[in-house]
Each structure stands twice: as structure tokens, then as C-alpha cells.
Amino acid sequence: MPQLSPYRRLFEIPGARAFTAGNLLARLPMGMFSVSAVMMIAGARGSYALAGAVTATGLAATGLVAPWTARLVDRHGQARTALPATVIAALGSLSLLLCVRHDAPDWTLFASYAATATTPNTGGMSRARWAHLLAGDAKALHTANSFEQAADELCFMLGPVLAAFLCGTFFPEAGTLVGAVLLLTGTVLFTTRRATEPPVRAHIPGKAPLRAPGIPPLLAVCLAMGGVFGATEVVTLAFADAQGRQSAAGIVLALQAAGSCVAGLLYGAVNPAGPAAARLPWCVAAMAALLALPLLAAALTGSLPLLAVALLVAGMATAPTMVTTMTLVQERTPEGRLNEGMTLAVTGLLGGIACGSAIGGWTTEHLSPTAGYAVPVTAAAVALALSLRSPSNRFTKCLAPH
């Protein structure tokens, strides 16, 4: 079993532990806000349709605003940009809370939640710091990227659970309130660690990341992979509901995230062979193959516990795939525009999640929850086809006729 000493060496870097602690605190609410908003709005207004529409509007607004926020971070620095942007987002959350609490018109909910779109990409800023601190050390950067992906999975695994606990145990607005406080506190702790912040350039030369060679195909892969995540979540909720065990859906999805988290930490402790461009198709192929397990478990057994095991195993392909993708984004993004490049990748994922959720929901409603598990498999196959479009990867060469 690989030793985890690379992580110890990572956090021996001066300032690494401090900025990581603040960033994790700021990142945890990312898994809380959506669930908190749905529980708060649906509980007060009695409409899940309204709650879903409000959160979908916020997701769309984030897709539009996030790249601009990231561009400002690259241009003016993390501390000067992220903190004001976070204050605006926190005020948006507070406004949403007050509008729901005082029975304000529905349009105020949409406007308030849209304001939270200024939330900076905290994970991207942390990765940018690692890229700055570990410049020239590809092995250490691989470990750092793996840790960041595991942290993402952990936050998105614990966030919904914490949100549901707060809203259900205390009062419906508790999840939104605590999330806003954590976001603001974590961002303050993170941005005040100036010693590890990447330097700011008055003028950033080169093309925008969207025009950089190799970035658009990666964004297309991210879009397809987002479809995997969005469809899997919706279909699993529907499958558990059809079994009469809707309350267990969160645990089942948490197991998938746990599998990815463990795989990410193990992946970061080893030194994978070959360039990232050659590894990506293999990672996506593994994801596509393992996603067949939930489909088979649902179709052949109809057992929720077996489905949970299948999702746990399938989740183990997620982190290596995402780590490799983000490594390629870092390699291909023009110098000085790393936050923008990684935020574009996240935006692609969010767009895919929205599409996957819609297609997965339609499939479960018009066919069956079991048939819905074909959607993430199809999305993964599309991601594989897109990743194979690069003629430079070894996967393509292996399949080519001699």
C-alpha cells in the first residue's frame, strides 16, 4: 500500500496548513447552500417547484458570473477580490433568509439567490496557491491536486448532511445562516494568509483561457462528466424513493463521494506514469466501465444496499479522473490566468450537472429509475469519446491499426 508521506511533505511548506484550513472552512458551505435553500423555501412556501427554480436560477447565474470573478482574482489578487465578492454572496444569502422569513414576493427569492453567484471559486484559488508554491515539481503538484479533489468530495459529502441536520434540528433558516458565516469566516482566514498568495501581474499577456489550445476540448469533457454527476444524484434519489427509502438516498450518495475521496488520497500518494494527456482517456474509460455497476445492480437485483456498494466502487474512478483533468487545465491555461481557467472547468461541470439532472429526471419519470442509470453511463461514454479526440494520447495510439 502506498505511503502517505507525500502529504506530510506537502504540509511542511510554510503557510500551507494555515491557508488550507481557511479554505476548507470556506469550501464546506458549497455543499450546504443548495440543500439549505430547498429545505428553507419548500418548508416556508410549500413548493418544491419554487425551491428548485430558485436554486436553478442561482446555478445559472453562477455559470455566468464565476468566470468574471475568477478573472478579477487573477488580475487583482485573491485578497483584494475574493473577500469583497464573498461579502456580496453572504449578503445575498442573508437577503434570501430574510425574504423567506418575512414572506416577501417570490421574485425577491430569485434576486437574492442570484446575488450569491459572486461566491469565488475557493477550490480553484487553493489549487492556484499550490501551483505557485510547487512550480516545477510535477510530482508534488499531483499530490496537491489529489488532496484538493479529496477535499472537494469530503465537503460535498458532509455539506448536505450538515445542512439537513441544521435545518431539521433548529430552524429552517439555520443551514443558510451557518453556511454564510462559515463561508465568510473561512474566506477571511484564507485571504489573510498573504505569504502563499500567487503574485499579481499588472498586465496579463496571452490569450484568454477559453481561446487557449487544448482548453475547449477539456471543457467539453467537463460538461459530459458533469452530466454523470447530475444524473447519478437525481436517479439515485428517485430509485430510493421508489423503494420507499428516500431518507437513505443521502447515505447512498455519500458512499459514492467517500469512494472518490479515498481513491483521490491514494492516487495522490503514488506517482502515475506518463503525461496527464495520456492518462485522461484511461481514467474516463475506467469511470465509464465502473458506472455500469450501478446500472447492473439496479436492473438485476433492485436492491438499495447493493446499489450503494456499486456506487461506492464506481465513485473510486471520479477523483483520479478529476485530478487528471484539473492537471491538464493547469498545464494548458496561459500563465497568470489560472483561476479563470479552473473556474471555466468548474462552470463546465455545473452546466453538465444541470443537463444531467434534467435528463436523468425525465428518464426516471417517463421510463423508470433503473433506466435512469443508463444516463450517467451514456454521459461517461460521451466524455470518453471527447477525451479520445486528441491524437497525442497513448490510448488512441493503442487502438489505432498498425
Segments and roles (model prediction):
Residues 2-63, 209-254:
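Helix-loop boundary and gating motifs at the non-cytosolic
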Residues 37, 120-135, 236, 320-333:
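Intracellular juxtamembrane helix-capping segments at the cytosolic ends
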